[in-house]
From Swiss-Prot:
Membrane recorded as keyword: yes
Protein name, as recorded: GREB1-like protein
Main location: membrane
Family, as annotated: Belongs to the GREB1 family.
Protein topology in the membrane: Single-pass membrane protein
GO BP field: branching involved in ureteric bud morphogenesis; cardiac muscle cell differentiation; cardiac ventricle development; embryonic heart tube development; kidney development; male genitalia development; mesonephric duct development; metanephros development
Length: 1923
C-alpha cells in the first residue's frame, strides 16, 4: 500500500481493523475472514473521508508494517517500474498493484488548453486504430507499431510507435528496461517515460502506468494493406528472464554461488521456487508527493510469494541478480553475474500467507521483476550481515532453504552463503482442477496451515539420516500424505465440528519437542520480530565455532510474529548436506565449468600437493622412480604369466596370443524382441498413413532412404556405422551396391557437431529431389542436448547447444511429406512433457521384459536398472550394485578439509590415488594394501591378474566414469605414469573415452586384438568399445553424459564413485548405471545365488572340462516347455548360418576362460543388432524377415507362392558359446560401484518397487507442473509412465519443445504427425530394431507396389476341340477367311469356372468319369495367386497418387465437383419391354466426348469415331467398366495403363452407390443404372451397357449420315472390362538354341493402349462379334501360344461389336456365368469370337466388392444368432410357411442350382456321356454335371448330339422360339426335367404349350418357388421324371 495513502486513515482505526483481522485469521480455521482493506474501505456504513481524516500520520504507524504488510502479503508502491500484471483487462483496471481499493492513480494534470478526449492525444490527433488502419504511417528505423489499451475505451486500440529494444522478443526476453516512444498522432518524439507518454495519449489510468500492462498488441498490415491487431506482446515470458540473487562470488559459475544463470534458470532441475508478485517499494511518499531520488542503499529485489497459487508459481519462480542502483541504466544486462562491490545482495523473500482469502482462488499470474527499482530505506531488523571469513572459520558454507515468509536482505560476505529454493514450492498451494484434487484424495477447502508445514518440515529433517540430503520429491509426497490425512479426518468428523489447529503459542514448544529426538542434529530457533534475527544469530554462532565443535545439521528458524503470523526458513549447516545442496543447484554444464575453473585457476593446488605423498607419507614420484630403477629395462610379462615374471619390452611387444578366438564380429542377428518392436514401429507408421489426417501417403513411395543423427561421440558414430555395415541394410534398401556399401555407409550417419548444418542441407536436398522416396530421419539418443536454438544463441554454452532443435524441428523437416522422424531414446522423459511434439499414440515402447516367466529357449535375458536394484535382495556375498563405504569415509574427511573445492574434484583426486596405490600394493609395495579400499584392490587385482591366467591374453574391462574432461585427462596421465613405472604397460591398456576423439590404443594391444579377430586387414584399428572385447583395460569415460555407446562382453567393473549429488535427476542418474546394462545368461536371474556367488578361488576352478561343456551345451540348446519362445521368423540359428552342431564343435576346441566374465553387451542383443549376416548367404534370411507382410519377392516381377513359415527354432542369444571365444560359462552382469548418494537412490528399493530414482525430476530440462501430484507407481509400464510425465511435467524455457505451446484457437498442442518415438532400456537392442524397421518398411512399400494376381492354369485343356485350321505362328492378326473355318471350342477354359458345370462336347463324352474329382462346393476354394511388381502400365485404385495422374484423379478445385452435370438418357428396350432411363454424370472436362442439343441442355449421343480413323494417340472404343462395392479398391484409374493418352472411360454403377463413386472418382464419367437394378447382378449391367451402346451407335449413324458419312463407317465396338484388370502382357515364343532344350516363352509388360490399338487394327474387324485376350498364368507354355488365335470363350476384357450382336443379349437377370452364357449364344448365332493368344490379362485378387455374395438372411429376423441358411433352404413349396429370405429371387435360384444337382439331376452326376440338355441357357448346376447347350433359334449352329441320351432337361425362362419339337431329343429312362418360369401361371402355360406332359410325369408336390415373399416376385419351377 505504500505511504501514498497512509495519511488517509486514522491510525487508530487502521490498527484496530488490522489487529481484528490478524486475530480472526489466527483463531479461524475454516471461515475466511474479510481482508482488512475490505473492512476499512468497503464497509457499507463507511462515511466518505473528511478532510480531517486525510492527514499524514505516518509516524503513528509501525513503519515496518506499512512498508511490508498489505492485504495479500504483497507490497504496493506508487512510483516504480515493476509490473504486477493481471491476466484480465478488467482486473487490471479494477485493482491496484496491492489489491487495494481503486483510488484513481494521481496523474499530472494535462497542460492547459490541451485535448483530453479519450482516443486522442493531447495535441488533439486521433490515435484510434479504426481511424488509422488505412493510413500510411512513417516510423523511424528500429521502431514498431504497437497497440495500447485505455480503460475508458475498452473497444478501441490506440496506435503508438515504440522503440523495439524496449519490447520483448518472441520468447519474452531481452526487453530493455524503461521506454522510448513517439506519438503517431501529432508526431511528437522522444518520450522517455511511459508515465509521460500515457499522459500524452490520454490513457487516464486508475493504476500505475506500466508498459507491460498497457501496451498490449503488435500491429500488423494485412495483404490488403490494412493495419490491424496482431499477436499479443509477449510480456509474460519476462517472468523467466531474471536470474537469481547473485552472491558476491569472484567468478560467474562458482559452486558457492546461489546464482542461477539465465541460460538455465534451474537449480539442478528445480525451478527456483517463488513468484514475483510485487517489487520493492519506491521512496516513502509523504502526503502523496513522491520524491524522485534517494541516496539510501539500494533495495533492488524484494519479491514475495503470492498467496494466490498462480499458474506460474507452481514451479517457475526464479531468483534474480541484483544490479546497479540507477533507475534507468540501460547498458546493464539483468543477467550480469558481477554486481558492484559493496551493494546489498537481495535474497528472494517470501511473504507470509495471510488467511484473508481462499487458498485455492483463481490464479493470478503475476509478472516478476525485470529490472532495477528505485532504492528505498531498508528497515532495521530486515537485514543480515554475513560474518567475514565464515567459510574459512567454520569450514561450512550454510545453505538457507527458503521456507515460508519474507527472507531478509544479506550484506557483507555474501559469497559464503547459498540461498536455495529447493523446498519452497512444497509450501505453495498449486492451482489444480477439482478432478485432479479428487484423484489425489484432497478437497479444495482443506490445506495445511503454516504451523503444520513447519512441524512437518522439522519432522522430515529429523527423519533424514546423517548421510541423507533433503530431496524435494520426497518432501512433496510427505506434504501430500499429510493433506490426504487432513482430508480424511475432515470427512470423518461430524458436520460443524472443527479440527483443532496448532495455536501460535503451541508452535515453538511443539517444534522443539519434535527436534529433541534428533540427537542435536536439528535445532529450532524461535524469534519474535523477523527471520533476520534467527538467521543472524545462527550465522554468528557458526562463525564463532571452532572446527572441533559439533554443529547441528539443520537449524529451523521460526519467526512467531503477532503481526505477520508465522514465518520460517531452514539453515543447513551439515558439512555433507550443505555441500550437496549447494552443488545440486548447479546444472551439469555449470558444475563442469566450475570444475574447469578450479583446475585452471589453480585452486586445486593444495589438494594436488596433498596427494603427492602416499598414504604412508612417502613421496609418490620418488617412490615410483625407485621402483622403475629397481626393475631396470624389463617389463611385466603381457599375459600367460605371473606379475613377477619379467621380459624385455621387445619380447613383450612381440608376444602374440597363440589362439585365434575368431570373434566372428561380422555375423549379425536379429532377435525376436527386436523383430517385434520393428513390426510395432511399422504398424504405427501404417496407423499414421491410415489415420485420415493425410499426413502420410505410403502408396506414394517406392523406396526408403535414411539418415541417422547421433550425439557428438566419435565412438558412437563408428558403432552405428558398424551396425549399418554388418546389417547389410544399405544393400537391402537398394541404396548402395554390395561392393561400395562399406565405404558409402558414412554418408548415412551424422553427428551433432558444427558440420551438421552442411551435411543436413545435403540430406534435405535429397528429400526434396526424391518425392517418391520415403526418408526416415533417425535421431538416436534424442534426449541428449535437447535445448532450443534460441537458448543456445543467447547463452555461451556448449557448441552443440540447440543443434538438435535446429535440425529436428526446422520447418523443412516438419513440412516434408516424404520424411518420417524417428526419435530413439533410452531415457525419453524429456520428450514426454506437456509440450511434447510427439503424440503419445506415436510412441513405440520396447516389449515388456518380464524375467519372471519362463522364456523358453532364449538363453540371454536383459539385465537392466531394475534388475540391478532387485539384485540387492538376492543375498549374494558379492552384490552387483555396491557402495564403497571406506572410500566414502575418506571423501568426507577430505571434503571437510577442502570446503571451497567441488566435491567431484576431491573425489577424483582420491580415486586416482586409490587406483595408483592399489597397483603399487599388488606389484611392489604390499604395505600399501591396507591403505587401498578392498573394493579398489580387488578390482585392480582382477584386472592385472586375469591376462596372466591363459595363453589368449584375454582380460577384463574397467570403466571409470569421470564427467569432467580435464579431470579425466589428469586421471589418465597419472594412472598411465604409475602403470608404466611399474612395468605394466604391456599388461593392460588405459584408454581415454572422450566423445570428441577417436579411440587411441597402443600398437601392441592392437596387434593382440587383430590376432584374436584373425581376419582383419593390416590397417585395422579398434574404433568402438566393442572392438576392445577381451582387452584388459581401464576406460576412463568422460563427457557430460554417456551417449549410448555399447561396451563389450569383457566389461566387468563400472566405477561410478564420482557420480554424486550433482546427479539428482532421473535421466542423469539412470543413464550412468545404463552403462552396465546388458544381456546375461538366464541362470543369473533364475538362480542368482549359484550363478554369481563365486569367490576368487572358485572362479579359478571354474574352468570346465570338455565333458561339462558338452552337457551344458545340450542343456542350452534344449527348448524349454511352456515357452513364450521366439519363433524363427528371421533370426534362427539355421537362418544365420550357424547350426547347433557346428557350434558345439567350435566351442569345445577353445580353452576356457575364468567363469566370471561379464558379456556386458554382446554382439547379439546389444544396441543395434540387425537382421542377419551381411555376407552373400544372407539374402534368403532377409527375404524371410517380412513373413508377416506376405510372400517374399522374387528377383523377377513374379515369384512362387510362399509356403508357410517354419516352426519355432532355438535362437542363439548373445554370449551363448556360438562364437567359441568365451566357452560355455555364464554371461554375467558387470559389477557397479556407486557413490553413497547414488546408492541410496538406486539401492533403496523395497521389494518390487521402482528404484526411487524414478521419483526424481525426470530431466533437468523439464519442471514439475505442480508439487501436488500422485507418486509414480511401481507397477507403471513405460506407456503409463509416459502419460504420467505428459500430465505432470513442463518443458523449461531453454528446452527445444518449449515453443510448442497450446494453440489458442483450438486449445490443443501441435503434434508433428510424422514423428515417432522408440523407447527401450539402455543397450536393449534398439539400433538393430530400427534398422530392421527400415528393412521391413521398404519391404512393405514394395508390397504396396506389388499386386496379388490370379495365377491359374487353364482348365479343361484335355478335351478342347482340335483346331482343324490354324494360322501360321507369328501372324499379328487373324485372317478372316481361315479363322471363320475354325470350329468354336465350347469348353470353358477360364480357371474361375473350375467349380462350374462343364459344357458338353463330343470329346467330353470320351472322358473317363473318375477324372473329375468331387469337390466340396460348400467351402469356397482359395484361388492361387502370386505377387508381382506393378509396372508403369498398371491400372490403379484410389490409393495410388502421383504427380502425373493427379489431374486424372482429383479435381483441381473444390468447385469442380459441382461442375459435373447430370444428364438423363432414355431409350426403349424390347427385351425389357419398356423405356429405360439412365443417367450420365459428365465432368466439364469430359463433355467433348458427347453431343448436346443446340441449347446445350439435352444429351443427344456419345461421339463415336470412324472405322477408318488412324490416331496413334487415341483408342477408338469407349471403355465401359461395371463396378459395385469397389469405390476405393476398383482399378478404375487407367491413366498409366493408357499411357496418359485421351480415352473415353465410363464407370457403370448402381444408383445407390453413385455418391460414393462420385466422391472417389470425381473426374470420371458415370453411367448410373436405374434404381430397379440396385439389387441386380452383373448381367444387368452388361445388358444395359450393350443396349445403350447399340442405341448410341444408331444415333451416331443418323447424326453422321447427315454429314455425308456412310452408316457402316461408324465404329461399332465398345470395350467391356472388369474393375480388377491390372496388367497386360505380350508373349512370344523364343526360338530354341542349337542344343536341344524346351522352347521358352518370353513375356513383356505392355500398356492397355498397346493391346487395344493392336486389336482395333485387326483387318476386317467389323466382321468379328467379340475379340478378347487370354488370362495370364505363370505356367503359360509355348504349346498354349502355338496357335496365335483361338475361336473360344473370352472373359473379363472384351471388344464387343454392338452392331453384329444386336440380336444377341446378355441375360439381365444373371448373377453368375453371364459371360459364358453370352459367348454360347453369340457362337450359336454364327458370329465369330476371336481370342488373341499372344496377349494376356492379369487380374488382381480384390478382396472386397464385385460379385460378392449377398449375405442371405431371413426377411423377418426373429433372433440375431440364427444358424446359417443352407442352399437347400433357398427354395420352398409354394404357399408354405417356410422362412422367407431377403435376397433376390434370381440369386437364390442360381445359388440353389449350384448345390442341387444331386436332387434335380441324379442321372447326370459324373455321367458326361449323358449331359443335361439346356435350351438357350448356360447355368451352373454343379461341377459334377455336364450341360449340353442347344439354341432354339432357327439357323443356329449347335453341337452335334446325334445318339446322345440326355440325363435331364433344363428349361429356363424359355421364350416362344422353344417349341414342341423338344420331342426329337432322346432321354435316359428316369431322366429328370426342371422348368423355371417367372410365375405360376406361365409355368403351367409353358408345360401345356410344350406338350411336356406327353413324355414327362409331374406331381403336385414337385412344384417349388424361390424362398421369397410374393412382394419380391419369386421364381417358380417344376420338376418331373421322363416316362
Amino acid at each position: 500500500m505504500g505511504n501514498s495513502y497512509a495519511g488517509q486513515l486514522k491510525s487508530a482505526r487502521f490498527e484496530e481493523a488490522l489487529h481484528n483481522s490478524i486475530e480472526a485469521s489466527l483463531r479461524c480455521s475454516s471461515v475466511v475472514p474479510r481482508p482488512i482493506f475490505s473492512q476499512l474501505y468497503l464497509d457499507p456504513d463507511q462515511h466518505p473521508f473528511s478532510s480531517a481524516d486525510v492527514k499524514p500520520k505516518v509516524e503513528d504507524l509501525d513503519k515496518d508494517l506499512v512498508n511490508r504488510y498489505t492485504q495479500n502479503g504483497s507490497l504496493d508502491f506508487s512510483n516504480n517500474l515493476t509490473v504486477n500484471e493481471m491476466e484480465d483487462d478488467e482486473d487490471d483496471e479494477e485493482m491496484s498493484d496491492s489489491n487495494s481499493p481503486p483510488i484513481p492513480y494521481s496523474q499530472k494534470p494535462a497542460p492547459e488548453g490541451s485535448c483530453t478526449t479519450d482516443g486522442f492525444c493531447q495535441a488533439g490527433k486521433d490515435l484510434r486504430l479504426v481511424s488509422l488502419c488505412m493510413e500510411q504511417i512513417d516510423i523511424p528505423a528500429g521502431f514498431l507499431l504497437v497497440g495500447a489499451k485505455s480503460p475508458n475505451l475498452p473497444e478501441h486500440i490506440l496506435v503508438c510507435a515504440v522503440d523495439k529494444r524496449f519490447l520483448p522478443d518472441d520468447h519474452g526476453k531481452n526487453a530493455l528496461l524503461g521506454f522510448s516512444g513517439n506519438c503517431i498522432g501529432c508526431g511528437e518524439r522522444g518520450f522517455r517515460y511511459f508515465t509521460e507518454f500515457s499522459n500524452h495519449i490520454n490513457l487516464k489510468l486508475t493504476t500505475q502506468p506500466k508498459k507491460q500492462k498497457h501496451l498490449k498488441y503488435y500491429l500488423v498490415r494485412s495483404s490488403q494493406g490494412v493495419l490491424s491487431k496482431g499477436p499479443l506482446i509477449c510480456w509474460k515470458e519476462c517472468r523467466s528472464r531474471q536470474s537469481s540473487a547473485s552472491c558476491h562470488s569472484i567468478k560467474p559459475s562458482s559452486s558457492v554461488s546461489s546464482t542461477v544463470t539465465p541460460e538455465n534458470g534451474t537449480t539442478n532441475g528445480y525451478k527456483s521456487g517463488f513468484t514475483q508478485t510485487d517489487a520493492a517499494n519506491g521512496n516513502s511518499s509523504h502526503g502523496g508527493k513522491g520524491s524522485a531520488s534517494s541516496s539510501t542503499p539500494a533495495h533492488t529485489g524484494n519479491y514475495s510469494l503470492s498467496p494466490r497459487p498462480s499458474y506460474a508459481s507452481g514451479d517457475q519462480a526464479t531468483m534474480f541478480i541484483s544490479g546497479p542502483p540507477k533507475k534507468r541504466h540501460r547498458g546493464w544486462y539483468p543477467g550480469s553475474p558481477l554486481p558492484q562491490p559493496g551493494l546489498v545482495v537481495p535474497v528472494p523473500t517470501v511473504r507470509p500467507l495471510s488467511r484473508t482469502e481462499p487458498l485455492l482462488s483463481a490464479p493470478v499470474p503475476q509478472t516478476p521483476l525485470t529490472g532495477i527499482l528505485q532504492p528505498r530505506p531498508i528497515p532495521a531488523g530486515e537485514t543480515v550481515i554475513v560474518p567475514e571469513n565464515l567459510l574459512s572459520n567454520s569450514g561450512v558454507r550454510p545453505v538457507i532453504l527458503i521456507g515460508y515468509g519474507t527472507l531478509p536482505y544479506f550484506y557483507g560476505n555474501v559469497g559464503d552463503i547459498v540461498v536455495s529454493p529447493l523446498l519452497v514450492n512444497c509450501y505453495k498451494i498449486p492451482q489444480l482442477e477439482n478432478k485432479d484434487l479428487e484423484k489425489l484424495g484432497l478437497t479444495g477447502s482443506q490445506f495445511l496451515s503454516v504451523e503444520n508445514m513447519i512441524l512437518l518440515t522439522i519432522q522430515y529433517l529429523v527423519r533424514l539420516g546423517p548421510d541423507q540430503v533433503p530431496l524435494r520429491e520426497e518432501f512433496e509426497q510427505i506434504m501430500l500424505k499429510a493433506m490426504q490425512e487432513f482430508t480424511l479426518r475432515e470427512r470423518a468428523l461430524q458436520i460443524g465440528a472443527q479440527c483443532v489447529p496448532v495455536s501460535p503459542g503451541q508452535l515453538p514448544w511443539l517444534a522443539r519437542l519434535i527436534a529433541s529426538v534428533s540427537q542435536d542434529l536439528v535445532h529450532v530457533v524461535v524469534t519474535q520480530n523477523s527471520l533476520a534475527e534467527g538467521i543472524s544469530e545462527t550465522l554468528r554462532t557458526l562463525s564463532e565455532m571452532r572446527h572441533y565443535q559439533r554443529l547441528p545439521d539443520y537449524v529451523v528458524v521460526i519467526c512467531a510474529s503477532k503481526i505477520r503470523g508465522n514465518e520460517f526458513c531452514v539453515v543447513v549447516l551439515g558439512q555433507h548436506q550443505s555441500r550437496a545442496l549447494a552443488e545440486s543447484m548447479l546444472t551439469t554444464s555449470e558444475f563442469l565449468k566450475e570444475i574447469s575453473y578450479e583446475l585452471i585457476t589453480g585452486k586445486v593446488s593444495f589438494l594436488a600437493s596433498h596427494f603427492k605423498t602416499t598414504s604412508l607419507g612417502d613421496d609418490l614420484d620418488k617412490l615410483l622412480e625407485k621402483m622403475q630403477q629397481r626393475r631396470g629395462d624389463s617389463v611385466v610379462t603381457p599375459f600367460d604369466g605371473d606379475l613377477n615374471e619379467c621380459v624385455s619390452p621387445q619380447e613383450a611387444a612381440a608376444m602374440i596370443p597363440t589362439q585365434n578366438l575368431d570373434l566372428d564380429n561380422e555375423t549379425f542377428h536379429i532377435y525376436q524382441p527386436q523383430l517385434t518392436v520393428a513390426r510395432k514401429l511399422l504398424s504405427q507408421v501404417c496407423a499414421i498413413a491410415d489415420s485420415g489426417s493425410q499426413s502420410l501417403d505410403l502408396g506414394h513411395f517406392s523406396k526408403v532412404d535414411f539418415i541417422i543423427i547421433v550425439p557428438r561421440s566419435e565412438v558412437l558414430v563408428q558403432q552405428t556405422l558398424q551396425r549399418i555395415r554388418q546389417s547389410g541394410v544399405l544393400v537391402d534398401l537398394g541404396l548402395e551396391e554390395n561392393g561400395t556399401a562399406h565405404q558409402r555407409a558414412e554418408k548415412y550417419v551424422v553427428r551433432l557437431d558444427n558440420e551438421i548444418q552442411t551435411k543436413f542441407e545435403v540430406f534435405m536436398r535429397r528429400v526434396k529431389q526424391n518425392p517418391y522416396t520415403l526418408f526416415v530421419l533417425v535421431h538416436d539418443n534424442s534426449h541428449v542436448e535437447l535445448t532450443s536454438v534460441i537458448s543456445g544463441s543467447l547463452s555461451h554454452s556448449e557448441p552443440s547447444h540447440g543443434l538438435a532443435d535446429r535440425v529436428i524441428n526446422c520447418r523443412e523437416v516438419l513440412e516434408a511429406f516424404n520424411l518420417l522422424v524417428l526419435q530413439v531414446s533410452s531415457f525419453p522423459y524429456t520428450l514426454q512433457t506437456q509440450q511434447s511434439r510427439i503424440s503419445s499414440s506415436n510412441e513405440v515402447h520396447w516389449i515388456q521384459l518380464d524375467t519372471g516367466e519362463d522364456v523358453g529357449c532364449e538363453e540371454k535375458l536383459y539385465f537392466g536398472l531394475s534388475e540391478y536394484s532387485k539384485s540387492l535382495q538376492w543375498g549374494i556375498t558379492s552384490p552387483l550394485l555396491r557402495c564403497d563405504e571406506t572410500f566414502e569415509k575418506m571423501v568426507n574427511t577430505l571434503l571437510e578439509r577442502y570446503p571451497r573445492l567441488h566435491s567431484m574434484v576431491v573425489r577424483c583426486y582420491l580415486l586416482i590415488q586409490q587406483y595408483s596405490e592399489a597397483l603399487m600394493a599388488l606389484t611392489t609395495m604390499a604395505s600399501l594394501r591396507d591403505h587401498s579400499t578392498p573394493e579398489t584392490l580387488s578390482i585392480m587385482d582382477d584386472l592385472i591378474s586375469s591376462p596372466g591366467k591363459n595363453k589368449s591374453g584375454r582380460g577384463h574391462m574397467l570403466i571409470i566414469r569421470v564427467p569432467s574432461v580435464q579431470l579425466a585427462m589428469l586421471a589418465k596421465e597419472r594412472l598411465q605414469e604409475v602403470r608404466d613405472k611399474l612395468g605394466l604397460q604391456y599388461r593392460f591398456e588405459i584408454i581415454l573415452g572422450n566423445p570428441a576423439t577417436e579411440l587411441s590404443v597402443a600398437t601392441h594391444f592392437v596387434a593382440r586384438l587383430k590376432s584374436w579377430r584373425g581376419n582383419e586387414p593390416e590397417e585395422w584399428i579398434p574404433r568402438t568399445y566393442q572392438d576392445l572385447d577381451g582387452l584388459p583395460c581401464i576406460v576412463i569415460l568422460t563427457g557430460k553424459d554417456p551417449l549410448g555407446e555399447t561396451f563389450p562382453r569383457s566389461l566387468k567393473y563400472c566405477d561410478l564413485r564420482l557420480i554424486d549429488s550433482s546427479y539428482l535427476t532421473r535421466t542423469a542418474l539412470e543413464q550412468e548405471v545404463g552403462l552396465a546394462c546388458c544381456y546375461v545368461s538366464k541362470e543369473v536371474i533364475r538362480g542368482p545365488t549359484v550363478a554369481l556367488d563365486l569367490s576368487g578361488k572358485e572362479q579359478e576352478r571354474a574352468a570346465v572340462s570338455e565333458n561339462d561343456s558338452d552337457e551344458l551345451l545340450i542343456d542350452l540348446e534344449r527348448p524349454q516347455s511352456n515357452s513364450s519362445a521366439v519363433t524363427g521368423t528371421s533370426g534362427s540359428i539355421m537362418e544365420n548360418g550357424v547350426s547347433s552342431s557346428s557350434t558345439a564343435d567350435k566351442s569345445q576346441k577353445q580353452s576356457l576362460t575364468p567363469s566370471f566374465q561379464s558379456p556386458a553387451t554382446s554382439l547379439g542383443l546389444d544396441e543395434g543388432v540387425s537382421a542377419s549376416s551381411a555376407g552373400a548367404g544372407a539374402g534368403e534370411t532377409l527375404k524371410q524377415e517380412c513373413d508377416s507382410l506376405g510372400p517374399q519377392m522374387a528377383s523377377s516381377t513374379t515369384s512362387k507362392p510362399s509356403s508357410s513359415s517354419s516352426g519355432p527354432r532355438t535362437l542363439p542369444w548373445p554370449g551363448q558359446p556360438i562364437r567359441g571365444c568365451r566357452g560355455p560359462q555364464a554371461a554375467l552382469p558387470p559389477v557397479v560401484i556407486l557413490s553413497k548418494a547414488a546408492y541410496s537412490l538406486l539401492g533403496s528399493q523395497k521389494s518390487g518397487k521402482l528404484p526411487s530414482s524414478s521419483s526424481l525430476l525426470p530431466h533437468a530440462d523439464v519442471a514439475w507442473v505442480s508439487s501436488l501430484r500422485p507418486l509414480l507407481n511401481k507397477d507403471m509400464s513405460s506407456e503409463e509412465q509416459s502419460l504420467y510425465y505428459r500430465q505432470w511435467t513442463l518443458a523449461r524455457q531453454h528446452h527445444a519443445d518449449y515453443s510448442n505451446q497450446l494453440d489458442p484457437a483450438s486449445g490443443t498442442r501441435n503434434f508433428h504427425p510424422r514423428r515417432l518415438l522408440l523407447t527401450g532400456p539402455p543397450q536393449v537392442g534398439k539400433t538393430g530394431s530400427y534398422l530392421q524397421f527400415l528393412r521391413i518398411l521398404f519391404r512393405m512399400l514394395i508390397r504396396l507396389l506389388e499386386v496379388d494376381v490370379y495365377d491359374e492354369e487353364e482348365i479343361n485343356t484335355d478335351h478342347n476341340e482340335s483346331s482343324e485350321v490354324s494360322q501360321s505362328e507369328g501372324e499379328p492378326w487373324p485372317d478372316i477367311e481361315s479363322f471363320s473355318k475354325m470350329p468354336f471350342d465350347v469348353s470353358v477354359h477360364d480357371p474361375k469356372y473350375s467349380l462350374m458345370s462343364l459344357v458338353y462336347t463330343e470329346k467330353l463324352a470320351g472322358v473317363k468319369q473318375e477324372v473329375i474329382k468331387e469337390s466340396k462346393v460348400e467351402e469356397p476354394r482359395k484361388r492361387e495367386t502370386v505377387s508381382i511388381m506393378l509396372t508403369k502400365y498398371a491400372a490403379y485404385n484410389t490409393f495410388h497418387h502421383c504427380e502425373q495422374c493427379r489431374q486424372y484423379m482429383d479435381f483441381t478445385s473444390a468447385s469442380q465437383m459441382s461442375d459435373s452435370t447430370l444428364h438423363a438418357f432414355t431409350f426403349s428396350s424390347s427385351m425389357l419391354g419398356e423405356e429405360v432411363q439412365l443417367y450420365f454424370i459428365i465432368p466439364k472436362s469430359k463433355e467433348s466426348h458427347f453431343v448436346f442439343s443446340k441449347q446445350g441442355k439435352h444429351l443427344e449421343s456419345m461421339r463415336l469415331p470412324l472405322v477408318s480413323d488412324k490416331n496413334l494417340n487415341a483408342v477408338k472404343s469407349p471403355i465401359f467398366t461395371p463396378s459395385s462395392g469397389r469405390h476405393e479398391h476398383g482399378l478404375l484409374n487407367l491413366f498409366h495403363a493408357m499411357e496418359g493418352i485421351s480415352h473415353l472411360h465410363l464407370l457403370v454403377v448402381k444408383e445407390y452407390e453413385m455418391p460414393l463413386y462420385r466422391k472417389y472418382w470425381p473426374n470420371h464419367i458415370m453411367l448410373v443404372l436405374p434404381g430397379m437394378f440396385n439389387n441386380a447382378g452383373v448381367g444387368a449391367a452388361r445388358f444395359l451397357i450393350k443396349e445403350l451402346s447399340y442405341h448410341n451407335l444408331e444415333l451416331e449413324r443418323n447424326r453422321l449420315e447427315e454429314l455425308g458419312i456412310k452408316r457402316q463407317c461408324v465404329w461399332p465396338f465398345i470395350v467391356m472390362m472388369d474393375d480388377s484388370c491390372v496388367l497386360w502382357n505380350i508373349h512370344s515364343v523364343q526360338e530354341p538354341s542349337s542344343q536341344p532344350m524346351e522352347v521358352g516363352v518370353s513375356s513383356k509388360n505392355v500398356s492397355l493402349k498397346t493391346v487395344l490399338q493392336h486389336i482395333e487394327a485387326t483387318p476386317k474387324i467389323v466382321h468379328y462379334a467379340i475379340l478378347g485376350i487370354q488370362k495370364w498364368s505363370s505356367k503359360l507354355t509355348s504349346q498354349s501360344l502355338k496357335a496365335p488365335f483361338s475361336r473360344c470363350h473370352v472373359h473379363d476384357f472384351i471388344l464387343l461389336n454392338t452392331d453384329l450382336t444386336q440380336n444377341v443379349q446378355y441375360d439381365f437377370n444373371r448373377y453368375f456365368c453371364e459371360d459364358a452364357d453370352f459367348n454360347l449364344r453369340t457362337n450359336s448365332s454364327g458370329l465369330l469370337i476371336c481370342r488373341f493368344n499372344n496377349f494376356s490379362l492379369m487380374k488382381k485378387h480384390v478382396q472386397v466388392g464385385g460379385q460378392r455374395d449377398f449375405i442371405i438372411k431371413p426377411k423377418i429376423m426373429v433372433s440375431e444368432s440364427l444358424a446359417p441358411i443352407l442352399p437347400l433352404q433357398y427354395i420352398c413349396a409354394p404357399d408354405s410357411e417356410h422362412t422367407l429370405l431377403a435376397a433376390p429371387a434370381q440369386f437364390l435360384l442360381e445359388k440353389f442350382l449350384q448345390h442341387a444337382s444331386y436332387k434335380l439331376f441324379p442321372k447326370a452326376i459324373h455321367n458326361f456321356r449323358s449331359p443335361v440338355l439346356a435350351i438357350d441357357c448356360y447355368l451352373n448346376i454343379g461341377p459334377e454335371v455336364a450341360i449340353c447347350y442347344i439354341s432354339s433359334r432357327p439357323h443356329s449352329s449347335n453341337v452335334n448330339c446325334e445318339g446322345v441320351f440326355f440325363s435331364g432337361l433344363l428349361l429356363y425362362l424359355c421364350d416362344s422360339f422353344v417349341g414342341a419339337d423338344l420331342k426329337k431329343f432322346k432321354f435316359l429312362k428316369g431322366a429328370t426335367l426342371c422348368v423355371i418360369c417367372q410365375d405360376r401361371s406361365s409355368l403351367r402355360q409353358t408345360i401345356v404349350r410344350l406338350e411336356l406332359e406327353d413324355e414327362w410325369q409331374f406331381r403336385l408336390r414337385d412344384e417349388f418357388q424361390t424362398a421369397n415373399s410374393s412382394d419380391d416376385k419369386p421364381l417358380y419351377f417344376l420338376t418331373g421324371r421322363h416316362v
